[in-house]
Every structure is written in C-alpha cells, then in structure tokens.
C-alpha cells in the first residue's frame, strides 16, 4: 500500500447483541467459523441473525487497517472456478460456509451454482472475504456503492463507508471510484473488506486516458482488468451488451444513456464506428476472469434513467445480448449475474424479471432499485425501495442500494446507512413474500417482543437498534419506560396492545382462555338473556320506565 491512510472506523458490537460464531466442518478437515449476530433477549433466550459486519463487531478481534483482515480457511486456488467445481459435484469450503450461513443444505448451494442460478463471488486473491451466495433460492442480498469522485472524498472516508455499510447489512460493496488514487483506494478497501467487492473496470481505464473515451483500447482495458483481478476484485461490471447498432435506439429517450459505463462505450463505438471491444473480445475476457474466479456482472449500459424510458427497445435489445454473453461466459466456466434497471413504474417491473430469466438462463438478477417514480429527489432511497421490494418478490437475487443523495451528490456516511437500511427492508420484504424458509422468524420474534412491551428486545431485533431506541427515548427517556405498557403515541389508556392484554388477562382470570370455555360462556350468557326475556312476558317491546 503506497498511500499513508489513517481511517477512523466504527467497531464494537451492535446494541443488544454480540458477535458469535458457529463452527462447521468443511472439506479436507477444515473447521469453518461462520459469523452471526447474537441478540440477547430479556427472556433469557438468544436469537441469531445473519451478519455481514466481519471482525469489526468482534471485541476480541485485533483491527489493523494497514495490515488488513486475516485470510479465510479452506481457500483453494488451483481447482478452477466455483462454477466448474460445482458442475464436477464438489462441495467447496465456500459452499459449506454458505450453507451454514443461509440455513440451507450444502448440496442445494452446489446445485444452484452448477445450474448458473446462483453465484459465489470469491476471487482467489480476496481471502479476507467471508463467502456468500447470490441467487433467488437464497436470501435477497444488498449491495452498497461507495467510492470517491473527481470532486470529493478520500481513501480514509471510503474505507470508513465500507466498514459502516457492512455493519448495517451490506452483503457486497462496489468501489466506483472515479477520482484520484483509484488503485490505492481499492487496495485499502479489498484488504479490509469482509464482503465481496465489485468494480467497473472501465472507470479506471478511462482515468488512464485522462477521461477521453475515444482513446480507450482493448489492450488498455484488458490490462486494467488483470490489475484488478490480481488485487482481488470479486465481481466486475462489464458493459459488453452496448452495441453500436443499439445506440440509435436511445435517441428519442427522455434521459438518453444514463449509465456511466454505457455512455463511455457508446461514445467509443460512435467515435470509431466499430463494434464495442468489450463485445468483440469477450471470450478473452472470460479466460482472464476464469483464472481468478472473478464473477461477471454483465452491465445494463442502456438501462432506463426515467419512467418514460422504461422497458423500451434499447433496454431489451441489450438484455438479449446479455443472454448471448451469459452462455459464452458459462461455457468458459465463469460465473455470471445480470444487472437490471433503473427507473420502472410498478406495473412494468415484473416483466423485467421474467424476460431476464428467459433470455439469460435464470442467471441471478442484480438490479438498481428500480425507482418507481422520478419526482422525489432527496428521497430516492424510498422511491427505489418500493420498486426493489416488488422486484425482489419477483425473483431478483441482489438489490443495489440507492441513497438519499442519488441524482444530487456523493453520499456521505449517513446516506450510506440510510440506503442500506432502506434496502434491507426491501430485501426482507421480498424474502417474506417469496416464502423464504427463515424470513418470518425475525418478524415473529420482534412482534412478540412488541406485544409483551419488551422495548429493549424490540430495539435489539430491529434493523437499526440505535435509531429505534433514539426515537423511543425522545419522549420517554426514563429507564422505567423500557418496561411500560405504552409509548408516547397512544399513552397508557389508548394502547391497543395493552387493552388486548387486559382482555386476555380478564379471560384467563374467569376461565375463558380456551375455545371450549368461551363457547360455554356464550351459551350461558344467551340462556341468561333468554330467561330474562321470558320473565318480562316474552314481549319484544317494553314500556319506557322513568
């Protein structure tokens, strides 16, 4: 590492929980330590959660950013890609690790990878990463974009954002740096990232030619890809589907080509009036990525950047080409996922998933949102989380977060957290709707804590314990309020859950805590009213008494 950096990062357990590990047996006698976040409930029970924070939440870990994180056990460099090994029937250490993490069988993980419906982004040269899987049979994942720009940010800030994003649940990180020290920034992130790291190599290639797309060459791009593979990048966005003949299809769009990589390649194609060098050299690119087991993230360079442009001819023409490239990559043993839009109104979202599955052999779909409306700058983490939840339910495997700063500026630390939390909500909502076998367990645990007024347990089980506690304590800060049977919204007399508990307590006190007892009580009450009616002469109407 050639640049001196002293990042300030957040470490230590998340409130109400501790770092724990589950030991599982891996291949070749290797013991794997699978991380989890263990929530300690006031009932004395523990509740374990999927954890992406790496050693940064482990108080026993020694963190030295200049040295980087330790290598994972069981790493094998010379047996081919995860796809090739899965096809050969091998359950790798990464697959065994993932199976324990997801609560699934290792054979299911192997089978989904072998079929190309799931990917394990795990470059041989990124041993610091904890293995994870992206595929629709598993929990929906969330990616957080970080990276500097030519205008602002530093290496220290981007390392801090990486640690901060993974603390709150980012499953992967993309370093989209376009400013100074791109190589050094990526090196610091990779050596300290507990999750897979993705990049868009064309950005660094463009920086090497001083920002002039027309000066790009295949040789320059190829060398940049090799440089990043050597560093340990786990997956790469490659806009190989932007073809010369597709560029005119964007001419009448409201927002044209909004992908940075897509616009760079479109400019090169038009300047040279030749087919994209990413497309014409794709097989050589496959050979390079296969050597390191780097996963393709085939970029949607012609994605719609506005509601008006959703699902148009340009977008779907590129998707068909991505389907063609998917087959080529898999034939070379390279794992593939497909990037998707973008800006899409709700009623057009599912069509994107179904077409991607049809054209791309069900390769994992990785989508940016999509934003369901264009009218809310500063709130696009919300407009996009709406679309993200819908597309996750339909089968998207990973969601690329959008922050409140989208379309406005480079996100800071707070924006990163807001984006991650919004997308963890969307991903979890998608898992619930898909019927993921473990998704509802957390909802049930939190709902039970809510009904029993176990406030500290509610905070600890939530996606953001700090903010949940902060909001509660704004109006009821005293410690006894953590056991009170109300909050400041309804107060003690109008709390529906307290009233329901009172009703249940009354029922239990009077022996009405079973269906049979309630039925008997109803019959007794009806008999009492029948007798009262007879006592009044069986008259329907009685005289009014003063």
Curated annotation (Swiss-Prot):
Keyword Oxidoreductase assigned: no
Binding-site positions, Zn(2+): 343, 407
Gene3D superfamilies: 6.10.250.620, Radical SAM ThiC family, central domain
InterPro entries: ThiC, ThiC-associated_dom, ThiC/Bza_core_dom, ThiC/BzaA/B
Enzyme class: lyase
Pathway recorded for this protein: Cofactor biosynthesis; thiamine diphosphate biosynthesis
Binding positions for [4Fe-4S] cluster per the UniProt entry: 487, 490, 495
Residues making up the signal peptide according to the UniProt record: none
Keyword terms: 4Fe-4S, Iron, Iron-sulfur, Lyase, Metal-binding, S-adenosyl-L-methionine, Thiamine biosynthesis, Zinc
GO BP of this protein: thiamine biosynthetic process; thiamine diphosphate biosynthetic process
GO molecular function, one term: zinc ion binding
Gene Ontology annotations for the cellular component aspect, listed alphabetically: cytosol
Cofactor annotation: [4Fe-4S] cluster
Matching HAMAP family: ThiC
Function: Catalyzes the synthesis of the hydroxymethylpyrimidine phosphate (HMP-P) moiety of thiamine from aminoimidazole ribotide (AIR) in a radical S-adenosyl-L-methionine (SAM)-dependent reaction.
Family: Belongs to the ThiC family.
Name of this protein: Phosphomethylpyrimidine synthase
Primary gene name: thiC
